[in-house]
Curated annotation (Swiss-Prot):
Keywords: Ribonucleoprotein, Ribosomal protein, RNA-binding, rRNA-binding. This is Large ribosomal subunit protein uL3. Belongs to the universal ribosomal protein uL3 family. One of the primary rRNA binding proteins, it binds directly near the 3'-end of the 23S rRNA, where it nucleates assembly of the 50S subunit. Signal peptide: none annotated. InterPro entries: Ribosomal_uL3, Ribosomal_uL3_bac/org-type, Ribosomal_uL3_CS, Transl_B-barrel_sf.
Length: 208
């Protein structure tokens, strides 16, 4: 069965296993998510569970949003997302961190850090030219096809805005779950800046 939860990235730290091995982990704080709506094939055309995370101040919420969350008997939420193919949950139910356990393999989605306008070396990992005195090619994007096609090729790597994209890292392992602090520790790093929204789901390719 698919499992999922929304949380906020706190930062990175490190833990030690019983064997003394050091593991770098990302700390995700996931306070209880509330089920706001259950979608079915009959009514919506697909099966999904809509969950809300992080209470929003009453002043910042409008009447339709308040009416929507009132059915779940909860406060307005800052983040609302859907998880498909989750069964056995009703409106108003809570999803907590102990839904997952240490050793579970998950897919983690977040918004990568925005880097602004960057050149091709930083943005695409291209190699630079010689830095010698006689060289006239240092950090340029390279050939634009000026002779034969008389145009710039489609998908040519050029400078532009970097980061700020939705990124999913697959098959990350949960190192530890701390229910009393609503915290999940995930091995390695996950996309996004501190305090950014993180989506944790059961890995799609875990059994393959």
């Amino acid at each position: 069965m698919t499992k999922g939860i929304l949380g906020k990235k706190v930062g990175m730290t490190q833990i030690f296993t019983e064997a003394g091995e050091l593991i770098p982990v990302t700390v995700i704080e996931a306070t209880p998510n509330v089920v706001l709506q259950v979608k079915t094939v009959e009514t919506d055309g697909y099966n999904a569970v809509q969950v809300g995370f992080d209470d929003l101040r009453d002043v910042l919420s409008n009447k339709p949003a308040k009416g929507h969350v009132a059915k779940a008997n909860t406060a307005p939420k800052r983040f609302i997302r859907e998880f498909k193919n989750i069964e056995g949950l009703e409106v108003g139910a809570e999803i907590t961190v102990d839904t997952f356990a240490a050793g579970d393999v998950v897919d983690v989605t977040g918004t990568s850090k925005g880097k602004g306008f960057q050149g091709v070396i930083k943005r695409h990992g291209q190699s630079r030219g010689p830095m010698a005195h006689g060289s006239r090619y240092h950090r340029r994007p390279g050939s634009m096809g000026p002779v034969a096609p008389n145009r710039v090729f489609k998908n040519k790597h050029l400078a532009g805005r970097m980061g700020g994209n939705r990124v999913t890292i697959q098959n990350l392992e949960i190192a530890q779950v701390v229910p009393e602090k609503n915290v999940i520790l995930i091995k390695g790093n996950v996309p996004g800046a501190k305090k950014s929204l993180i989506t944790i789901k059961s890995a799609v390719k875990a059994g393959k």
